[in-house]
């Protein structure tokens, strides 16, 4: 069962314009009370590049030690999306 706070790899294609695309980690933010439905609400995660100097108010820093991802990352809260569970590829961590 998908739970709020879980991190999964999702296939976010197809997308339009500047939406986050491809297979990438995402954190589930929808309520556990509705996560049994076919759709869940997620925030995509992107790897943190060494050139990043600022974390913006609509971003959350996610160290690799916490997420179990291979790199320090940033949760992109401004890219909130509802997606079908068929996009779930692989469970990573809670």
Task: State the predicted function of each range.
Residues 1-94:
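Conserved functional hotspots at enzyme active or ligand-binding sites that engage polyanionic ligands
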């Amino acid at each position: 069962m998908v739970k709020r706070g879980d991190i999964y790899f999702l296939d976010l294609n197809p997308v339009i314009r500047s939406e986050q695309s491809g297979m990438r980690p995402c954190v589930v933010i929808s309520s556990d009370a509705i996560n049994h439905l076919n759709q869940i609400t997620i925030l995509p995660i992107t790897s943190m590049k060494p050139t990043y100097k600022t974390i913006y108010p609509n971003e959350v820093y996610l160290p690799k030690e916490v997420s179990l991802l291979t790199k320090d990352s940033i949760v992109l809260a401004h890219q909130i999306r509802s997606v079908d569970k068929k996009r779930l590829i692989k469970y990573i961590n809670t």
